[in-house]
């Protein structure tokens, strides 16, 4: 980790811009955040700059800003921190999210470093969400805490996770995430390990065109190893 600390400091800021569509509705979001990459937490303030108020649940977007901000994951010393080690060149990731009612999201993200600030460029496409489902009816109430399993494959790092959105009328709405993380230079890959995450919306206006989020994340080995 010593080499990454030459580039990534104890406290870092980031800027994020998302362009996307959900069931054909176009939108753009911009935000600024900050946090402590080696302690595993960060916050971000976001604003819908085009297409608001959004006609779908904000929750399907929220993981792409912070669950997508992988440089803020705390790692133990014996697990190589693939994303931090990729800087200053940075890395990219791709993600597919399959929702239990047939909705599908594909996301691409580019993470770079400019003048000591992380820059995230995100493209988001959501399709096939039923008009009477939780997403289009805005019936979700945030994500449960979750654990991603990560493993090296074909020179990149892959991640898989089963996440659950809480519903206003009780119960859960299930989503399968599959992600691929790709450094822009040769980087030491970790073995098989886990990352625990908890993402919360800490404030928002009535129509969710201004939102603040907070996330805690930490990598670990399996508890029985």
UniProtKB/Swiss-Prot annotation:
Contains a chromophore consisting of modified amino acid residues. The chromophore is formed by autocatalytic backbone condensation between Xaa-N and Gly-(N+2), oxidation of Tyr-(N+1) to didehydrotyrosine, and formation of a double bond to the alpha-amino nitrogen of residue Xaa-N. Maturation of the chromophore requires nothing other than molecular oxygen. SUPFAM superfamilies: GFP-like. The modification (Z)-2,3-didehydrotyrosine is found at residue 67. Pfam families: GFP. Fluorescent proteins have become a useful and ubiquitous tool for making chimeric proteins, where they function as a fluorescent protein tag. Typically they tolerate N- and C-terminal fusion to a broad variety of proteins. They have been expressed in most known cell types and are used as a noninvasive fluorescent marker in living cells and organisms. They enable a wide range of applications where they have functioned as a cell lineage tracer, reporter of gene expression, or as a measure of protein-protein interactions. The keyword Oxidoreductase does not apply. Keywords: Chromophore, Luminescence, Photoprotein. There is a cross-link at residues 66-68 (2-iminomethyl-5-imidazolinone (Gln-Gly)). InterPro entries: GFP (IPR009017), GFP-related (IPR011584), Green_fluorescent_prot (IPR000786). GO terms for biological process: bioluminescence; generation of precursor metabolites and energy. Thought to play a role in photoprotection of the coral's resident symbiont microalgae's photosystems from photoinhibition caused by high light levels found near the surface of coral reefs. In deeper water, the fluorescence may be to convert blue light into longer wavelengths more suitable for use in photosynthesis by the microalgal symbionts. Homotetramer. Belongs to the GFP family. This is Red fluorescent protein drFP583.
């Amino acid at each position: 980790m010593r080499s990454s600390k030459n580039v990534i400091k104890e406290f870092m800021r980031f800027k994020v811009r998302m362009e996307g569509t959900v069931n054909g509705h176009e939108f753009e979001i911009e935000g600024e955040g900050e946090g402590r990459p080696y302690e595993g937490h960060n916050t971000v303030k976001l604003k819908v700059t085009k297409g608001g108020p959004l006609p779908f649940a904000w929750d399907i977007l929220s993981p792409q800003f912070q669950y997508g901000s992988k440089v803020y994951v705390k790692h133990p010393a014996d697990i190589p921190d693939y994303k931090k080690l990729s800087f200053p060149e940075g890395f990219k990731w791709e993600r597919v999210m399959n929702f239990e009612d047939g909705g599908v999201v594909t996301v691409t993200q580019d993470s770079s470093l400019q003048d000591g600030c992380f820059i995230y460029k995100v493209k988001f496409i959501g399709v096939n969400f039923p008009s009477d489902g939780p997403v289009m009816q805005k019936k979700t109430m945030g994500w449960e805490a979750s654990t991603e399993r990560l493993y090296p494959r074909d020179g990149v790092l892959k991640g898989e996770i089963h996440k659950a959105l809480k519903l206003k009328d009780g119960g859960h709405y299930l989503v399968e995430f599959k992600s691929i993380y790709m450094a822009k230079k040769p980087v030491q890959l970790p073995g098989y390990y886990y990352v625990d995450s908890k993402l919360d919306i800490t404030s928002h206006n009535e129509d969710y065109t201004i939102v603040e989020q907070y996330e805690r994340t930490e990598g670990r080995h399996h508890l029985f190893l």
